[in-house]
């Protein structure tokens, strides 16, 4: 039997459908639920638990067999003890998003993945600081504050335990070998085998097939980042664009995912965007479903993804699929992968400030004859590996 330790996230149902197609009836799906009802998952095969750890040790651990396998879909401290309790000969795999390996414990890799202005903001406004949830009452926020303090105090212990967990994992399911090498370099003793797998990131959804044809008198529409998180390095990207402030541009900045719309980061980002660009800076604060979100791509001319850490792959592949030009941070493992595959639509962020308005206009109408980026996603290999490792 395959035991999947999962979270209530939007791609969980898609994975379950893939797993059941390749290994029907051979999987149990445990989802940690921190809200009264599931918000993003609907599969009837899911077993929801407030404490997956308690459920595991009372209901599953006594009946484990040596041939069983455990697969993690989001690695946090709630599953550490489960992994460390497993027999040595048992397969333990992680279907990696990378975010769980980079974002926790708090403040571990921020200096590496944030650019100077964003890191200065992080140190002053976010590191070790507690932000109230204004939609909840005082008692709830008091409990949150207690958890916040506990996470800070126990961060060194969490890191030591997490390294031991990573040493126990022997299968690393992921699609980007550059991410895999990042993990090997940052987690001592990690020697898991890389197995090709990619989550469904929605590229089969409705995407604009025929882009809007613009002439050189129309404004240039720029898409900035993918979420309201400091790892987008938004502040630096706005500085890189500032030489275009008087030009015919608009900047669409999606902020409905990540931090709350009234968070310090979101408010200061909007303030900076409006200060430099005025009404040309357009924050998206309302949640859109996937098809609505992708429908907006039709009007976009240019995309900026200033992340250093592995992030926004779904957005990047979707923009590539519809032929958009993307400027990316060169340290990004996704940038490194796309450049290694000779994807011509990708440009380094460091060159953006050297492009004039007219040069960017010309770039957006330039023809690209190579593969569009999504072709490097090997769905057949993904299906073969699911069948191989889950049956």
Q: Where do the PLM segments sit?
A:
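A conserved mid-protein helix/loop that constitutes part of the nucleotide-sugar donor-binding site
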Residues: 14, 229-243
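Short N-terminal targeting/anchoring amphipathic segment
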Residues: 60-79, 91-95, 302-303
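Active-site proximal beta-strand in glycosyltransferases
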Residues: 69-70, 87-144
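A short, active-site helix/loop in glycosyltransferases that binds the activated sugar's phosphate group
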Residues: 130-194, 385-388
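Conserved donor-binding/catalytic core segment of Leloir-type glycosyltransferases
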Residues: 211-232, 251-253, 374-375
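Glycosyltransferase donor-sugar binding loop
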Residues: 251-267, 283
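Nucleotide-activated donor-binding/catalytic signature segment of Leloir-type glycosyltransferases, i.e.
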Residues: 266-287
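A charged, aromatic-enriched C-terminal amphipathic alpha-helix characteristic of glycosyltransferases
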Residues: 355-391
């Amino acid at each position: 039997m395959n035991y999947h330790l999962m979270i209530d996230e939007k791609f969980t149902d898609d994975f379950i459908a893939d797993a059941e197609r390749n290994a029907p009836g051979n999987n149990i799906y445990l989802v940690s639920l921190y809200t009264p009802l599931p918000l993003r998952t609907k599969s009837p095969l899911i077993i929801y638990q407030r404490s997956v750890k308690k459920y595991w040790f009372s209901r599953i651990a006594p009946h484990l067999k040596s041939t069983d396998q455990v697969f993690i879909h989001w690695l946090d401290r709630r599953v550490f003890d489960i992994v460390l309790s497993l027999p040595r000969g048992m397969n333990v795999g992680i279907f990696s998003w990378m975010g769980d390996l980079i974002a926790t414990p708090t403040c571990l890799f921020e200096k590496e993945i944030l650019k100077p202005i964003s890191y200065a903001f992080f140190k002053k406004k976010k590191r070790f600081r507690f932000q109230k949830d204004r939609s909840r009452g005082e008692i709830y926020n008091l409990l949150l504050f207690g958890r916040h303090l506990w996470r800070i105090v126990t961060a060194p212990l969490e890191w030591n335990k997490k390294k031991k967990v990573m040493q126990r994992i022997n299968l690393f399911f992921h699609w980007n070998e550059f991410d895999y090498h990042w993990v090997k370099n940052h987690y001592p003793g990690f020697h898991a085998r890389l197995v090709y797998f990619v989550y469904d990131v929605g590229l089969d959804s409705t995407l604009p097939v025929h882009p809007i044809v613009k002439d050189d008198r129309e404004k240039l529409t720029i898409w900035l980042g993918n979420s309201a998180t400091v790892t987008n390095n938004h502040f630096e990207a706005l500085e890189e664009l500032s030489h275009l402030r008087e030009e015919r541009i608009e900047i669409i900045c999606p902020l409905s995912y990540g931090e709350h719309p009234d968070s310090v980061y979101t408010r200061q980002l909007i303030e900076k965007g409006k200060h430099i660009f005025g009404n040309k800076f357009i924050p998206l604060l309302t949640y859109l479903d996937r098809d609505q979100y992708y429908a907006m791509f039709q009007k976009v001319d240019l995309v900026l993804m200033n992340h250093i850490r592995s992030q926004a792959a779904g957005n990047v592949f979707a923009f590539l699929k519809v032929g958009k030009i993307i400027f990316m941070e060169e340290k990004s493992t996704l940038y490194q992968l796309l450049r290694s595959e000779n994807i011509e639509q990708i440009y380094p962020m460091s060159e953006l400030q050297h492009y004039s308005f007219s040069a960017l206009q010309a770039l957006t109408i330039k023809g690209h004859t190579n593969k569009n980026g999504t072709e490097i996603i090997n769905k057949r290999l993904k299906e073969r590996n699911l069948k191989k490792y889950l049956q």
